[in-house]
């Protein structure tokens, strides 16, 4: 029997059927586009499903393919077995020949038998066939073509040999070809109690689609019968290379040996299984990424992440301290890139994703393994790990459940799956309750639906400024849409992961750009919903964007750097405020903008000029000391024990980020920060004010904005010097002299106004209006100082005993009312009551003062024409 390479097996299969008038159809994407119920393409027939059902037509009636396939989810979830058994894989190639109404059973069996025994030269006595127990036609074909007796044709009664597409639709019996590895391998023929052994291996499966299932009780013959076959490339190659384990074929051995040269650990013992896991998962991960799947916390992205993290854990077991997977990619591309050019085209992209994911997971892997070791120290063989701990590993450390199962497998420790699911449901319920009344009631359900379907957005921005991300949702006018086509449309975009920071913890969201194949998008803000969904506020600038598109997300680096500078400065400021103002100071709120920072604190009095100077000096000293800024992940409990300050407005998980700046500042924070305090440059407080009882607000600028502030103030100073015709040395004296002169002029002007408003008794008697024995003087005077009006009104009422004076000044929407009443008549006409009545009439809220002199405000200047009538009514009614 000739020995073939993997590439030769694939090539010979395709060439054989092409020679027999089959059209070579390229492999489809691993993402099924015609079957939303399917996670991944897992067989060769998937791309022909609609052809078999008659929904679509192809320009050919026979086809041959080498289809890349993945089985790692749903009923095909064999992940825990991959690497440990001889034949389980997450990624494999399925060779297949298909007939759509052309040939049927006899020709299909002939093609298979001829290829195996003549082209691949397999010994006939090593081959067996299975058929469905009622398929006498297939039995006759095998006897005729292969010369098999009844002892070589095994009749199977179970559904293993009857295939259906679903409850209804095309279906039919199967015939499988088995190869005998020899009696030195344990196992028995199909249908026997030893069938699960590795001696007899299925190498080819033929489905004879001859029926249509109408309902559970009705099955009819199809007018057009079809053939669907599948041969696992890896299995067939193992047979042709005289090995019983798929991982011993040339393709896997090339990857495994290449890996060994990097990690320097011999391929023996337990390490052998780790090498196999890495080789298999490298293929699955690379091909999935090439077809547009990106690791995430939901759907296909989560399956990919599970595969990648399992491989990374095995790399860790081999002692690999640095990211490994991306270093193996060139070997895979070299081996398979010519057959699958999409792998070669996407090589740099795949490499970035592999490296990014491994860097992210590496930090939590060791801590998660430490926790798992501690929690299982007392467990014995056959014991069960609690669902609570399994969930903590999943939720806090990113351990997929099957990764934890895989780790415990060799110790024969199982997991409490029911307890795990209970923890998962409890977390979802807590999340919903925590956000009740959050102010997002109108769109709460939309965000909950997104989170339920897609999970949380993974934030990449701690280490990356740009990344390839997949768009999972688009929102316009509070509604989910499938695409955005109109230029300049504003909308929200959600992706599986992003380098954009969503506004939280006081730090404003990032801005930047998103470039997809057919679109340019401007990101004008980044928001966060339900604590973990990052939404990009976007404007479409070019083309159109669709759900499912992959795109390059790139933040505005300068904008982010300014946010980092001001955010790190708030941490230093917080620590210094404790030192200067006292330990009573607590943070009440903050805003980190790219151009300034705002920090609200609990403090009962104004911060003095001397204190502000001291605060600035100490903050700038810490900046100049250029302390390293370190970020550490730890449990909330450990952080509290270390005395870490929690920041206002943050929601903390069981694992938190602790930001440390030298020995000065130690805080919990999810924001982005500088690498060293010196990166801040400089710090300057621009204002200090009260915003509520016992709460002060400090605003400040950092870095280049301090320089900008100095220049603005210098420019202002120059302008004042020029206006006052002096220099900075004489400026204070000149300003004081000017202010003093202004006071003198104001006094003179006040005297002038008072003199103008003053009346003699005779003038009062002549100008006042008599209403029921009471004199009234009413004037509307534009833009005169209230102080002057009070004095003038009081002067007049002091001269006579029966006078009411009303002055109204101001314009537009701000009016000031002054009322004075002679003391002799205040028991009947109270100035406060009159002022209040007039204020309410003019759209104000009342006033205050004394019975003889009161003031109030108003806003409705249009009613001034009716004031006299209002006064007349009030006086006559009293």
UniProtKB/Swiss-Prot annotation:
Residues binding Zn(2+) are: 567, 571, 669, 673
Bound how, and how many: what does the cofactor note say?
Binds 1 zinc ion per subunit.
Q: What is its EC number?
A: 6.1.1.7
* GO terms, molecular function: alanine-tRNA ligase activity; aminoacyl-tRNA deacylase activity; ATP binding; tRNA binding; zinc ion binding
- Which keywords accompany this UniProt record? Aminoacyl-tRNA synthetase, ATP-binding, Cytoplasm, Ligase, Metal-binding, Nucleotide-binding, Protein biosynthesis, RNA-binding, tRNA-binding, Zinc
- Chief location of this protein within or outside the cell: cytoplasm
Tell me, what is an example of a GO biological process annotation in this record? negative regulation of DNA-templated transcription
Q: Which GO terms describe its cellular component?
A: cytosol
Cofactor(s) annotated in UniProt: Zn(2+)
Q: Which reaction does it catalyse?
A: tRNA(Ala) + L-alanine + ATP = L-alanyl-tRNA(Ala) + AMP + diphosphate
Question: Pfam family example for this protein?
Answer: DHHA1
Does the keyword field hold Protein biosynthesis?
yes
Q: Does the keyword Aminoacyl-tRNA synthetase apply?
A: yes
Which compartment or compartments is the protein found in? Cytoplasm
Check the record and name the InterPro entries matching this protein: aa-tRNA-synth_II/BPL/LPL (IPR045864), Ala-tRNA-lgiase_IIc (IPR002318), Ala-tRNA-ligase_IIc_anticod-bd (IPR018162), Ala-tRNA-synth_IIc_core (IPR018165), Ala-tRNA-synth_IIc_N (IPR018164), Ala-tRNA_ligase (IPR050058), Ala_tRNA_ligase_euk/bac (IPR023033), DHHA1_dom (IPR003156)
What does the record say about domains?
A: Consists of three domains; the N-terminal catalytic domain, the editing domain and the C-terminal C-Ala domain. The editing domain removes incorrectly charged amino acids, while the C-Ala domain, along with tRNA(Ala), serves as a bridge to cooperatively bring together the editing and aminoacylation centers thus stimulating deacylation of misacylated tRNAs.
What biological function has been recorded for the protein in this entry? Catalyzes the attachment of alanine to tRNA(Ala) in a two-step reaction: alanine is first activated by ATP to form Ala-AMP and then transferred to the acceptor end of tRNA(Ala). Also edits incorrectly charged Ser-tRNA(Ala) and Gly-tRNA(Ala) via its editing domain.
Per the record, the similarity remark reads:
Belongs to the class-II aminoacyl-tRNA synthetase family.
Q: Output this protein's name.
A: Alanine--tRNA ligase
């Amino acid at each position: 029997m000739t020995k073939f390479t993997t590439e030769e097996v694939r090539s010979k299969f395709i060439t054989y059927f092409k020679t027999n008038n089959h059209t070579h159809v390229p492999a489809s994407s691993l993402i099924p586009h015609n079957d939303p119920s399917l996670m991944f393409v897992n067989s060769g027939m998937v791309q022909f499903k609609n052809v078999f059902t008659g929904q679509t037509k192809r320009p050919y009636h026979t086809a041959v393919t080498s289809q890349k396939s993945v089985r790692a989810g749903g009923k095909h979830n064999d992940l825990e077995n991959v690497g440990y058994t001889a034949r389980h894989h997450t990624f494999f190639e399925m060779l297949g020949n298909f007939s759509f109404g052309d040939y049927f059973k006899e020709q299909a069996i002939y093609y298979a038998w001829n290829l195996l025994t003549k082209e691949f030269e397999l010994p006939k006595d090593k081959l067996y066939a299975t058929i469905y127990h009622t398929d006498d036609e297939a039995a006759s074909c095998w006897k005729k073509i292969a010369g098999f007796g009844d002892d070589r044709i095994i009749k199977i009664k179970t559904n293993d040999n009857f295939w259906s597409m679903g409850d209804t639709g095309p279906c039919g019996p199967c015939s499988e070809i088995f190869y005998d590895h020899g009696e030195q391998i344990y196992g028995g023929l199909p249908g026997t109690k030893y069938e699960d052994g590795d001696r007899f291996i299925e190498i080819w499966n033929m489905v004879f689609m001859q029926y249509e299932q109408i309902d559970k009780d009705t099955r009819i013959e199809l007018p057009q019968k079809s053939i669907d076959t599948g041969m696992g490339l890896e299995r067939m190659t193992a047979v042709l290379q005289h090995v019983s384990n798929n991982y011993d074929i040339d393709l896997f051995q090339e990857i495994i040996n290449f890996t060994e040269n990097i990690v320097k650990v011999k391929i023996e013992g337990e390490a052998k299984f780790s090498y196999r896991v890495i080789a298999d998962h490298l293929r699955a991960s690379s091909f999935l990424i090439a077809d547009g799947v990106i690791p995430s916390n939901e759907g296909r992205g989560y399956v990919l992440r599970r595969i990648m993290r399992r491989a990374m854990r095995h790399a860790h077991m081999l002692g690999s301290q640095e990211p490994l997977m991306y270093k193996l990619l060139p070997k895979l591309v070299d081996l398979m890139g010519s057959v699958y050019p999409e792998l070669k085209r996407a090589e740099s992209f795949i490499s970035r994703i592999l490296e990014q994911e491994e860097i992210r997971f590496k930090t939590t892997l060791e801590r998660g393994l430490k926790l798992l070791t501690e929690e299982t120290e007392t467990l014995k063989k056959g014991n069960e790990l609690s669902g609570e701990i399994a969930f903590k590993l999943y939720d806090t450390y990113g351990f997929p459940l099957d990764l934890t199962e895989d780790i415990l497998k060799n110790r024969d420790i199982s997991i409490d799956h029911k307890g795990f699911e209970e923890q998962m449901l409890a977390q979802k319920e807590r999340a919903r309750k925590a956000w009740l009344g959050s102010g997002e009631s109108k769109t709460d359900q939309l965000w909950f639906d997104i989170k339920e379907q897609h999970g949380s957005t993974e934030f990449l921005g701690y280490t990356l400024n740009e990344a390839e991300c997949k768009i999972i949702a688009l929102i316009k006018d509070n509604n989910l849409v499938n695409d955005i086509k109109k230029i300049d449309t504003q909308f929200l975009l959600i992706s599986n992961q992003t380098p954009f920071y969503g506004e939280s913890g006081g730090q404003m969201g990032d801005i930047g750009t998103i470039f997809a194949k057919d679109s340019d998008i401007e990101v004008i803000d980044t928001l966060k919903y339900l604590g973990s969904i990052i939404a990009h506020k976007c404007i479409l600038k070019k083309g159109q964007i669709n759900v499912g598109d992959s795109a390059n997300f790139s933040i505005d680096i300068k904008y982010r750097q300014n946010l980092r500078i001001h955010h790190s400065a708030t941490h230093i400021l917080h620590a210094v405020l404790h030192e200067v103002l006292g330990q009573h100071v607590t943070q009440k709120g903050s805003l980190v903008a790219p151009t300034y920072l705002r920090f609200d604190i609990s403090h009962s009095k104004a911060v003095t000029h001397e204190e502000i100077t001291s605060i600035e000096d100490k903050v700038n000293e810490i900046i100049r000391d250029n302390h390293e800024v370190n970020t550490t992940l730890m449990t909330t409990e450990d952080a509290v024990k270390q005395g870490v300050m929690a920041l206002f407005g943050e929601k903390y998980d069981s694992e938190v980020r602790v930001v440390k700046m030298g020995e000065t500042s130690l805080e919990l924070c999810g924001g982005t920060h500088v690498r060293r305090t010196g990166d801040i440059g400089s710090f300057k407080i621009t204002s200090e004010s009260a915003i509520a009882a016992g709460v002060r607000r400090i605003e400040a600028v950092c870095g280049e904005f301090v320089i900008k502030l100095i220049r603005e103030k210098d420019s202002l100073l120059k302008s004042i010097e020029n206006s006052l015709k002096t220099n900075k040395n004489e400026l204070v004296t000149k300003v004081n002299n000017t202010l003093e002169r202004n006071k003198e002029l104001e006094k003179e002007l006040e005297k002038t106004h008072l003199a103008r408003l003053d009346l003699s008794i005779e003038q009062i008697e002549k100008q006042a209006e008599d209403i029921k024995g009471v004199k009234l003087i009413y004037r509307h005077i534009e833009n005169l100082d209230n102080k002057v009006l009070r004095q003038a009104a009081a002067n007049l009422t002091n001269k006579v005993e029966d006078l009411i004076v009303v002055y109204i000044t101001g314009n537009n929407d701000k009016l000031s009312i002054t009322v004075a009443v002679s003391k002799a008549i205040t028991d009947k006409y109270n100035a406060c009551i009159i002022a209040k009545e007039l204020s309410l009439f003019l759209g104000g809220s009342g006033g205050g003062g004394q019975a003889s002199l009161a003031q109030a405000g108003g806003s409705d200047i249009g009613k001034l024409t009716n004031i006299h009538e209002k006064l007349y009514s009030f006086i006559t009614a009293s």
